Amino acid sequence: MLKDIRFSYDRGTSWALDGVSLTVHAGERLCLVGPNGSGKSTLARLIAGLTAPDGGEVTLLGQRVYAAGPNADAYRAARHGIGMVFQNPEDQLVTTVLEDDVAFGPENLGLERELIGERIVDSLQAVGLANLRQSDPTRMSGGQQQRASIAGMLAMNPAMLVLDEPTAMLDESARAEVMRILDDLQARGTTIVHVTHHPDETVHADRIVHMEAGRIIGITAAVDNRSPLAEAVSQSETEGSIGTEAAPSRPTNDSPRQREREDGSELPLLSDGIGDMTNPIIRVSHLTYRYPSAKRAVIDDLSFTIARGETVALMGVNGSGKSTLVRMLCALTAPTAGSIEVAGVPVASTGKRGRNVRPKSANRKQLAQLRRHVGYVMQHPEHQLFADTVAEDVAYGPRNQGLGETEVADRVRESLELLHIGHLADRSPFDLSGGQQRLAAIAGVLACNPDVLIMDEPTASLDAQAKKRIHELLRTLKSRGVTVLIITHDREEAEQIADRVVRMPIAAPASGGPVTATVTEPAVSSNGPAHSVIHRLDPRVKMVGFLAAMFTMFAVNTPTQLALGIAITLAVIAAARLNPLRVLESIHPILILLVLMGVVNLFVVRTGTPVVALGPLSITDQGVTIAVLYACRFALVIILGAVFLTTTTPTAMTDAFATLISPLNRLGIHAQEIALVMSLALRFIPTLTDETRAIVDAQSARGGSIETGSLAQRIKAMSAIIVPIFAGTLRHADNLSLALDARCYEEGIRRTHWRALTIAARDLIFAAAVIIYIAAIIAL
C-alpha cells in the first residue's frame, strides 16, 4: 500500500511522483500504463522496494517500510518476497551458466542446496528453458534472456512480481511467451505489477492504473484490447506530451490481399525477399554468416534485392540474424560466405572464386564511398552518441564528409527540425531520455544525407507521438527517393510504412525436443569443455594449481625446462578438450606483442657468440635463446590463464576465491564482497567490450576516421569514445546494483552455495601433478 507518495530525482525541483496513493491486493494483476516520463518505472521500483520515496507512507507485504523515513530492516524483509524484472535483461544476468544464474537469488536467501536445485528445475520449466540450463545466457536471444531473468525471480518464489516493460525489445512470439508465463503466474495466485506500453498486454489484468505527469489519473478494469476503451488508452497516450507505443495488430488468415496504410495507399501481402531486379540499390546473394565458435550458421544462403527508393521492412524472430544482416550491409561485420553490393559498392565479393569461399571485404576507398551513401541507425541509441552536445553529435558525419561549416550548420538545423528536436541542440546527449536519444541518433545519420537509410528497430520503446514522427519522417524520405530498410517487430508498423517485407528464416534451434527436467544437481553437458576433467576440478584446487603452474613458468631458464612447460601446457589443453588453435586465436593480440618483445631482445642482448651481423647491430646465440625463452614462457602463462578462464565460470571463481581468502574476514575484510566484485568484473568485461565496439562502429558508420584515417586521426577518434564508454559503465553499474537488490544480495549475508565445493580424487591427482611439475622444473 502506498499513501500520498512523493519522489524527486532532483531534490524537489520537480516531482517524478506527486501525491500517489495506491493499494495492490494479494493475487491481483495490475498494469501501469501511461506516457513515457509519467512515473510508471519509478512507481514500479517503489512497489518492488528498490527505491525509497521522499515523502508519504509505504507498506509492502505487511512490512511498514517507509513512514517518516526508510526502515532498512523492514525493506530487507519485504524484498525477500518481491521479485522485479527490468526492461534490459542483459544487465540482470550475473554469470555465464543459466542454472548458476537462476541459483543466485535462492543462494542469497540462504536456502538449502537441495531446495535450490528443485527451485531451478521448476523455474526453468515454467519459462520453457529447461533444456538450456547449461547454456550461456549472455549469448541467448533477447526473448530467451528475458525468460531467464524471469526464471531467476521465480526461483526465489516471490509473493509479488514487478515487471518494467519486459517485452519492449521482443518479437511477437517472444512477447507472447512472456505473457503466457504471466498468465500461469496469475493462475497460481502470484501478485503481478506490470508496466507496459502495449494495450493488448492489459487484457488479463484485474485493474489498469493510468498515469500522467507523476500522478494517477484513473484506474479502470481491463477490457479486450480491440474495445473502444483500449483504443482510447492508446489515443490518450498519443495526445500526451510523451505517449506510448500502440499495440501491433494480428492479421488473421482471412485478411485481405491488400492493407491500407496511414496515408491511404495499400501494402502488398507480406512477401518474400525478391525485389525489383531492374534497378536494385542493395543486392545480397547467397549470404551466410556463422559466429566463430558456432556450429550452425545464423544466416544461411540468404538472397534478396531492394530497389532504389523502396521502403522495406525486415522482420523475423529474436535471434534470426536481422541485426547481424544489417551490420554486414554496412560493412561492420564480415560475412562467412556470399556477396553484398550496396549503392554500387562491393561490400563483400567472391569474384570468380565461387560462393563457398570467404568473400573479399571492401577496401578503404570503397568503405569511404559506402559511408557517403549509407546511413545506419543502431538499435540502442546510447551507443551512437558520443559528442558533448546534440548539435556537435549531429555535425559529426557532415564534417567527416568534408563539408564547410556553413553547410554543416545547415545540415544540423534541417535534421533537428525534421525530427522536431531543435530545442535539444545545446543539450548533452547523455542527459536526454531514451526516446530523445533515439531521435538525436537518427538526426545524426540524416545529416549525412544518405541515399540508403538502414534502421534497427527505430521505434522500439518510443511513445506514440515519437513513433508517429518516425513514420512521417520515413514518408518524407521516400518522397525524396531515399531507400529505407527498417527492422521491426511490429506487423502493424510494417503494414503502415513498408512497400514490402523481407522475412528472415528461422534459424535451427540450439537444442530441440521436449525436456522433462528432474535433476537437482549441477548439470554438465555430455561433451566439450564442460565435460572435461579440467572443468570438473574443484575450483579452489584448480585456481591454486593453475596459479602455481603459471608462476613456475617464470622460473623457466633452459630449453629443457621450456620443453617441459610446453608439454604440460599441451596436456592441460588436451585434458580441457579445447581446440589449441582456438585458444591461440583468443589471445593472438598478446602473442603478437610477445613476438615483438622477443625481436627486441634479439638486438638488445650483447653477450654470447654473434651469429648474424646487421651493420652496427648483431644477433648472438644467447640473444636468440633469451628471446625465445622470454617470449615462450610469457606465452605459456597467458595460455594457461586462458584455459582457466575458459573452463571456470564466474560463479565458480567467486566461490573459490571467497573460500581461499575467507581468513581475511577475521581482519574485518569482506572476502565475499571482494570475490563478487571480481566475478562481476569478469562477467561484464565482454559487455563493455561490445559496447566499445558499438561506439566505434557508430563513428565508422558516419565516416569516422577511426576506421580509415591516419594514425593521428584514429587516436583523436579513439579519444572521443572515452566519455560514452564511461557513461555506459556507470549505466551498467546502476542497473546491476538494482538487479542485485532485486535478488536480495546484501553485504555480509550468509549465502548458501548450490555448487558444493568438495575435494574429489581427480583434484588430488591434479594437485599431485602440479607438485611433480614444479619439482621437475626446480630439478632441471
Curated annotation (Swiss-Prot):
PROSITE patterns: ABC_TRANSPORTER_1, ABC_TRANSPORTER_2. Keywords: ATP-binding, Cell membrane, Membrane, Nucleotide-binding, Repeat, Translocase, Transmembrane, Transmembrane helix, Transport. It is an enzyme of class 7 (translocase). Signal peptide: none annotated. Residues 230-272 are annotated as: Disordered. Gene3D superfamilies: P-loop containing nucleotide triphosphate hydrolases (3.40.50.300). CDD domains: ABC_cobalt_CbiO_domain1 (cd03225), EcfT (cd16914). Residues 2-238, 282-531 form the ABC transporter domain. The chain crosses the membrane at residues 551-573, 586-608, 623-645, 759-778. One of its GO terms (molecular function) is ATP binding. It is found in: Cell membrane. This is Putative ABC transporter ATP-binding protein BL0043. The lineage of its organism: Bacteria, Bacillati, Actinomycetota, Actinomycetes, Bifidobacteriales.
